[in-house]
């Protein structure tokens, strides 16, 4: 008889997910303290890590990890690779335990085995972690690292993710390291091991790594020898060239569109390497693959300097000159023409020489010399005149009588002397003190007083100490200040120290009779005193409200009758004072009181404001 309740038992052959979290790898300082103070604890911790990875490598345990444990494992791998890669070149401890070293070596091996089993995508190793992986393992395992990067080493676990080529990521990461200034010698050694280390199999990784994109990255870093990472770019391209074959180099040049020297000039770093004799020795098949490199006749001295060929012709080939101007637009036409003359109109040889050492063309001046050397009358100075003729190197007609021996032997030394002279000139000009303009005032022309605003006073006006002298000085200063204020509003740079000696500054000094220091000090006073600047702005912005028109008397400042004018004014003042002190009648008092009431607006605060402005003007004049 069947039971009242039927039980259904479901049997599932699958395994449950494994939850086995792991902590991050300890940082450098903590590891150093554990080794120094408590190495036993550090040893047990490493043994635990080793046991953990041994368990993951058994069967399909790594595939059964749940999401949380897998995330912890990925975080541990990133921290471990970062710490071990950063430990290169550092002293962890003076005396490390042998057991600790052995367990660390085992842990390093188990981790690399796990990475090869799972692949880079499953463990999410990319960017900094990928480069740290290369730094840690490429020296002893170059083949495995290359297989992980290019995707040829397939993972042994069941994963649906496609293994992609990560060479481009490595190139971009190297570019970021160089641009940020974090590229070190150990990184350069890792690149060398990655590309050129001996392997059990044919090294196809270096061939695939050397791409047109890699050349463009290095060219951008080199920046015609002026970039921040030009040294690193030069070292990287040398390692890359020595790691590939001539056939691969030929393929890359075709991709870049390089077929002659004109197109090679678009890639100056690659062009510098391709015409180098050291590269030709390492790659003897290079000239047979790249036919435009077969120039021939390249004569080099045993020293560091090139030998200059003799020039049999005196006229420049215009077609070759135009081709050089298109190829090297940074140089002038005169420089290129003189270089062609020096190399007997051999455009291929000139192009090669400029690629090898651009200073040979920079030794020539950009324009022909305008000044001609006067002939020396003495007959013993014939050799000196010959040297001067070589130095001038003007038009081709001037060089017809030059001796070939003088050109071939004297030109290199002369070029070196010119380069050295130019370098010393730039060096001393950069540190030279500013020009002393103390005695420039003696050169100012003061003969024409009509061109200046501030006029000189006569000897009589200096002797007489009455009020008219102060009024005249205030009036002159007011006009000078208005003139300078208009210039300051138009262009404040006219008051800078660098404008000394210019035509504009000379005009300012003539119009104001002020020195350079006084003009510049007036501007600095306004910069440091905004209140003073606002007062001047009010003063000269609304000056149109002042009354204009004919006056009863115009001062003749240039005449010698100023003393008589002053005396007449003094007499008028005395007569007015006498009239004021005379007794007035009642009717006159009423009339005067009515006038005062009617014009009291012009007598009270307004007069005080004018007096205050005069006082500020005098204070500013004294400050300057």
From Swiss-Prot:
Location of the protein in the cell: Cytoplasm
Entry's Gene Ontology cellular component terms: cytoplasm; cytosolic ribosome
Name listed for the protein in its UniProt record: RQC trigger complex subunit CUE3
Function field: Involved in activation of the ribosome quality control (RQC) pathway, a pathway that degrades nascent peptide chains during problematic translation. Specifically recognizes and binds RPS20/uS10 ubiquitinated by HEL2, promoting recruitment of the RQT (ribosome quality control trigger) complex on stalled ribosomes, followed by disassembly of stalled ribosomes.
Lineage: Eukaryota, Fungi, Dikarya, Ascomycota, Saccharomycotina
CDD domains xrefs: CUE_Cue3p_like
Subunit structure: Component of the RQT (ribosome quality control trigger) complex, composed of SLH1, CUE3, and RQT4. Interacts with ubiquitin; the interaction is direct. Interacts with SLH1. Interacts with RQT4. Interacts with HEL2. Associates with translating ribosomes.
Deletion consequences: Defective activation of the ribosome quality control (RQC) pathway. Mildly defective ribosome stalling induced by RNA arrest sequences. Sensitive to anisomycin (stalls ribosomes in the rotated state).
Superkingdom classification of source: Eukaryota
Domain note: The CUE domain specifically binds RPS20/uS10 ubiquitinated by HEL2.
PROSITE patterns in the cross-refs: CUE
């Amino acid at each position: 008889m069947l039971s009242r309740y039927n039980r259904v038992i479901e049997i599932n052959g699958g395994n449950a997910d494994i939850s086995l979290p792991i902590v991050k790898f300890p940082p450098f300082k903590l590891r150093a303290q554990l080794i120094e103070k408590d190495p036993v604890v550090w040893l047990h911790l490493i043994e635990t890590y080793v046991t953990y990875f041994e368990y993951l490598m058994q069967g399909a345990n790594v595939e059964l990890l749940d999401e949380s444990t897998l995330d912890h494992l990925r975080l541990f791998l990133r921290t471990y690779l970062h710490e071990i890669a950063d430990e290169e070149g550092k002293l962890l401890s003076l005396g490390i335990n042998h057991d600790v070293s052995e367990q660390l070596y085992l842990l390093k091996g188990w981790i690399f085995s796990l990475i090869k089993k799972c692949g880079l995508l499953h463990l999410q190793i990319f960017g900094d972690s990928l480069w740290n992986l290369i730094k840690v393992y490429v020296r002893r395992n170059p083949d495995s690292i290359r297989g992980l990067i290019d995707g040829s080493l397939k993972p042994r676990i069941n994963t649906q993710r496609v293994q992609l080529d990560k060479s481009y990521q490595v190139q971009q990461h190297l570019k970021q390291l160089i641009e940020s200034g974090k590229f070190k010698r150990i990184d350069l050694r890792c690149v060398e091991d990655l590309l050129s280390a001996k392997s059990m199999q044919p090294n196809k990784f270096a061939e695939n790594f050397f791409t047109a994109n890699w050349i463009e990255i290095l060219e951008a870093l080199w920046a015609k020898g002026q970039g921040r990472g030009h040294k690193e770019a030069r070292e990287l391209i040398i390692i890359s060239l020595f790691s590939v074959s001539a056939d691969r180099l030929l393929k890359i040049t075709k991709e870049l569109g390089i077929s002659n020297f004109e197109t090679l000039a678009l890639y100056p770093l690659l062009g510098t390497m391709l015409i180098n004799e050291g590269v030709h020795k390492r790659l003897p098949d290079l000239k047979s693959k790249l036919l435009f490199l077969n120039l021939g006749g390249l004569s080099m001295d045993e020293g560091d300097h090139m030998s200059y060929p003799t020039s049999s012709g005196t006229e420049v080939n215009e077609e070759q000159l135009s081709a050089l101007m298109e190829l090297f637009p940074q140089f002038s036409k005169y420089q290129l023409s003189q270089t062609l003359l020096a190399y007997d109109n051999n455009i291929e040889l000139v192009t090669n020489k400029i690629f090898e050492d651009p200073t040979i063309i920079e030794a020539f001046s950009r324009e022909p010399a305008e000044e001609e050397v006067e002939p020396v009358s003495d007959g013993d100075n014939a050799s000196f005149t010959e040297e001067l003729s070589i130095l001038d190197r003007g038009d081709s007609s001037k060089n017809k009588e030059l001796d070939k021996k003088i050109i071939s032997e004297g030109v290199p030394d002369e070029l070196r002397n010119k380069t050295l002279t130019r370098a010393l000139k730039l060096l001393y000009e950069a540190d030279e003190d500013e020009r002393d303009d103390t005695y420039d005032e003696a050169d100012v022309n003061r003969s024409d007083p009509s061109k200046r605003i501030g006029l000189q006073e006569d000897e009589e006006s200096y002797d007489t100490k009455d009020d008219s002298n102060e009024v005249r000085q205030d009036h002159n200063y007011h006009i000078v200040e208005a003139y300078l204020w208009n210039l300051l509003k138009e262009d404040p740079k006219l008051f800078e120290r660098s404008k000394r000696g210019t035509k504009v500054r000379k005009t300012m000094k003539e119009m104001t009779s002020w020195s350079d220091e006084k003009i510049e000090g007036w501007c600095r006073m306004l910069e440091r005193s905004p209140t003073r600047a606002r007062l001047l702005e009010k003063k000269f912005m609304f000056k149109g409200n002042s009354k204009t028109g004919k006056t009863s008397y115009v001062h003749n400042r240039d005449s010698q009758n100023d003393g008589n004018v002053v005396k007449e004014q003094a007499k008028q003042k005395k007569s007015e004072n006498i009239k004021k002190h005379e007794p007035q009648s009642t009717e006159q008092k009423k009339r005067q009181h009515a006038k005062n009431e009617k014009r009291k607006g012009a007598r009270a605060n307004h007069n005080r404001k004018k007096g205050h402005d005069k006082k500020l003007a005098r204070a500013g004049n004294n400050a300057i």
